[in-house]
Swiss-Prot record:
The keyword S-adenosyl-L-methionine does not apply. This is Transcriptional repressor NrdR. Its cofactor is Zn(2+). It holds the Pfam family Zn_ribbon_NrdR. The gene is nrdR. Keywords: ATP-binding, DNA-binding, Metal-binding, Nucleotide-binding, Repressor, Transcription, Transcription regulation, Zinc, Zinc-finger. Belongs to the NrdR family. One of its GO terms (biological process) is negative regulation of DNA-templated transcription.
Amino acid sequence: MKCPFCGYEETKVLDSRPVSNGTSIRRRRECLQCQARFTTYERYEQTRIRIIKKDGRRELYDRKKLMNGILKACEKRPVSTDQIEEIVDNIEEQLRRSGNSEIYSSEIGDKVMEQLKSIDQVAYVRFASVYKEFRDLDSFLQAIRELKNS
C-alpha cells in the first residue's frame, strides 16, 4: 500500500482487527520510508445497488455520498468518524441482506435517522431537516417533539 504522506510503496501492518460486524478489517500501517502511521479499511466489494430517487431517477449507490451526508449532520458534534463508518457499514449490510438490486432513497434516509437517533439527537434533527425537507420552524418543532416522545 502506498504511503499517503510520502508516496513510498512499502508499508507494514502494525495492527489488524475486524470491525463493523466482521464485514471489514481495520489496519494500522506504518510507512517503511518516513515512519508515518495511517489507518486503512478493507471491505469486500458489494454488488452494485441502484438508488431510486424521489423524482424517479436511478443512480448507483455511492458510499461517499452517504458518508458525506452523515458527516455534515454530525459536524461539530461528539460523533467519531468510526461511529459514522459503523452507521454506513450497518446500512450497507442491511442493503446486502435485503437481496434487492434497487432501493428507494427514502428507505436509506429512514435507516440513517434510525441510527442517528440513538447516537446524537442534534445530528438526528440536522439530518432530518435536510432529508425531510423542512420548510419552516413548525417542521423543526414537530421533529423535536417526535424525538422527545420516542
